[in-house]
């Protein structure tokens, strides 16, 4: 699958409020952080039970929707090594091959309409459900971010240690197994963030917006 690769827009460093923060966490104290939250998916799961659409792709689309709202989660480094922002980013997501106990990484172009996205992504999942290559479509585009799923376990913490990953500004999401508590259905979600790209405020806003989106799943 091919998609036009846009040109990221450079950030005006003279007016960027986070210039000093970016420099600090990119050069002086390079670091990432992980935030794990429980998202209430009670209404979301109930709506999916009445829908033929796939819950995993609905989760992926919801993540892509809130990610694309905010420049800090569409950041990259341009060819000069300066911070820039993609006009749109696409989700790359895993599919598990139970026979080999390995997974493949797929990607689908983001569309603000869930139905359009699902119609593109669902056949990809079906086609590559037994994939033996890590990237059966070839490498994802540079304006992609990663989503993986661990539907076998519910967790309260998850961290990725990325050696020398200081150029990776895109967020990384990990989804877990639903758990029920006090009649509510909860989804564990871990978000791995480069601190140069976003602070705790930005990540909290992202997860809160995801909660709001899943609490009113009329878009399904």
Swiss-Prot record:
According to UniProt, the reaction catalysed is: chloramphenicol + acetyl-CoA = chloramphenicol 3-acetate + CoA
Which GO terms fall under biological process for this protein? response to antibiotic
Looking up Pfam families in the UniProt record yields: CAT
Q: Which GO terms describe its molecular function?
A: chloramphenicol O-acetyltransferase activity
Question: What EC number(s) has UniProt assigned to this enzyme?
Answer: 2.3.1.28
Key words, A-Z: Acyltransferase, Antibiotic resistance, Transferase
Catalytic residues, per the record, are: 195
Concerning PROSITE patterns, the annotation shows:
CAT (PS00100)
Which domain of life does the UniProt lineage start with?
Bacteria
Query: What family does the entry list?
Result: Belongs to the chloramphenicol acetyltransferase family.
Quaternary context: Homotrimer.
Q: State its role.
A: This enzyme is an effector of chloramphenicol resistance in bacteria.
What is the recorded name of this protein? Chloramphenicol acetyltransferase
